């Protein structure tokens, strides 16, 4: 178009027509483009406005839901006498996710209980106080609840699960139901995470047969009961060998296995380390619970018991001897018989307690004798002579050895013929006495006389000749036969 307008050969009319067409087309295109640009801007602005409105609406909805939840709880806590239908209608609008979140926080331990449960329990504990101004903190409310529970004396529920049926399946770490008549003292110490939670409970008062203290604990929890029921009339006692000991004097004992050995029968004087668990509390009837600590003393070993048995036996033998002496007189015949019977009964009872050990010792001795049959009683001749150490063995004994078997040194020997100690016992007589006696007997002889070796040699030669003669005679006799 512009080239045609620049052409000089065209007439002015044609140029004016072309200019009009050009301007109209340009304006039409500009209007068309302006329309498209306006639509794009409007669409982007509309999208941004819609997203912001949606976010704000969601935030408002969540805030409205949270406010509705807390408002409904406040209303139900401030006015406990309202009908449950109103609470159900308000809870319909509460989002299910909020309930799940509350359950999750309750299970994790972030909050001990939901606000409505705390308020319901506190309303039942103290109905005269109403309003939400008393519940600024959950911790303070729980502590006040524990103090009010300790002060109250009527049967009550410490923690109650209220609301929908979905809440009935949950059991919190501090929920417990106790039914007592006089007083209840509960001291609990709980810790978060993996720490061990311990609950110590001491109950004083009469316990119903139907009422049983139950504890529904959380992760790790140890409960210790120490109860001892004193009953005037004990009846309906069922024995359970795995978890109960025999009942003595109307007392029920629930025991647990202990590291130390304990006797089979228990009495009031004995103390055992068993922890008492009221597993079958309803069979105990009514009585006054008593708390007492129990310990155990280990049984002495075999050697100590053997020594005690020996001492007891010696004393018993001395007592029997005295009883026999007293029984010789006619006035003490009946008394001696009674004492003998009682002492025999005591000895039999005492020996019965040691019977397994004594039988085992006798069996060991018999087995040892079977293994070594050649070992017998050591005679005085077989006793070793160790100088003056063995002097006490033959101090009061008379020597049976012939005088020919003694030598000059006092040692028995059949090859010598000295007579120095024929009448003197070497081991019993001191050296000074023997020396004086030897000097007095010898008189003017020398202190150390020489031995007669020639006589000994002659006797040895004579013995050899006689033996040779016997050997020579025997073969001839054999040949003659």
From Swiss-Prot:
Extent of Low complexity compositional bias: 232-241
Source organism (scientific name): Arabidopsis thaliana
Lineage: Eukaryota, Viridiplantae, Streptophyta, Embryophyta, Tracheophyta
GO biological process: male meiosis II; microsporogenesis; regulation of DNA-templated transcription
Changes seen on gene knockout: Diploid pollen grains (dyads of spores instead of tetrads) due to defective meiosis II. Abnormal spindle orientation at meiosis II.
Additional free-text comment from the UniProt record: Diploid male spores in jason mutants give rise to viable diploid pollen grains and spontaneous triploid plants in the next generation.
Role played: Required for normal spindle orientation at male meiosis II and normal formation of tetrad of microspores. Acts as a positive regulator of PS1 in male sporogenesis. Not involved in female meiosis.
Region (Disordered) location: 226-250
Keywords linked to the UniProt accession: Meiosis
Protein name: Protein JASON
């Amino acid at each position: 178009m512009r080239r045609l307008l620049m052409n000089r050969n065209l007439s002015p009319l044609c140029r004016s027509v072309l200019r009009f067409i050009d301007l109209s087309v340009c304006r039409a295109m500009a209007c068309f483009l302006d329309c498209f640009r306006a639509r794009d801007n409007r669409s982007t602005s509309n999208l941004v406005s819609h997203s912001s409105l949606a976010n704000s609406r969601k935030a408002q909805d969540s805030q409205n839901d949270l406010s509705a939840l807390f408002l409904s709880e406040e209303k139900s806590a401030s006015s406990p006498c309202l009908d449950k239908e109103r609470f159900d209608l308000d809870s319909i609008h509460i989002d299910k996710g909020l309930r799940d979140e509350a359950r999750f926080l309750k299970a994790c331990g972030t909050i001990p209980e939901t606000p409505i449960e705390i308020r319901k329990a506190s309303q039942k504990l103290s109905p005269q106080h109403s309003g939400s101004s008393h519940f600024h903190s959950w911790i303070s409310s729980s502590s006040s609840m524990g103090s009010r529970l300790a002060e109250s004396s009527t049967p009550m529920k410490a923690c109650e699960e209220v609301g929908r049926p979905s809440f009935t399946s949950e059991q919190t770490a501090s929920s417990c139901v106790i039914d007592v008549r006089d007083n209840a003292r509960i001291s609990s110490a709980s810790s978060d995470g993996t720490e061990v939670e311990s609950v110590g409970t001491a109950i004083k008062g009469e316990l119903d047969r139907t009422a049983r203290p139950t504890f529904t604990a959380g992760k790790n929890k140890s409960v210790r009961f120490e109860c001892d029921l004193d009953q005037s009339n004990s009846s309906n006692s069922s024995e359970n060998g795995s978890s109960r000991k025999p009942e003595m004097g109307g007392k029920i004992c629930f025991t647990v296995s202990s590291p130390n050995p304990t006797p089979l029968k228990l009495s009031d004087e004995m103390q055992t380390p068993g922890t008492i668990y009221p597993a079958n509390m309803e069979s105990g009837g009514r009585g006054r619970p008593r708390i007492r600590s129990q310990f155990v003393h280990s049984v002495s070993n075999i050697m100590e018991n053997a020594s005690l048995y020996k001492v007891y036996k010696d004393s018993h033998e001395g007592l029997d001897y005295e009883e026999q002496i007293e029984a010789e007189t006619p006035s003490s015949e009946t008394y001696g018989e009674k004492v003998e019977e009682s002492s025999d009964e005591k000895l039999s009872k005492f020996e019965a307690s040691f019977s397994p050990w004594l039988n085992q010792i006798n069996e060991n001795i018999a087995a040892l004798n079977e293994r070594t049959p050649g070992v017998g009683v050591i005679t005085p001749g077989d006793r070793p002579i160790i100088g003056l150490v063995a002097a006490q063995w033959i101090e009061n004994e008379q020597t049976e050895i012939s005088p020919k078997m003694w030598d000059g040194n006092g040692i028995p020997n059949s090859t010598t013929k000295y007579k120095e100690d024929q009448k003197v016992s070497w081991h019993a007589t001191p050296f000074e006495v023997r020396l004086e006696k030897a000097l007095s007997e010898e008189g003017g002889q020398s202190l150390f006389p020489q031995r007669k070796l020639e006589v000994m040699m002659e006797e040895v030669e004579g013995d050899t000749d006689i033996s040779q003669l016997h050997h020579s005679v025997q073969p001839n006799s054999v040949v003659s036969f």
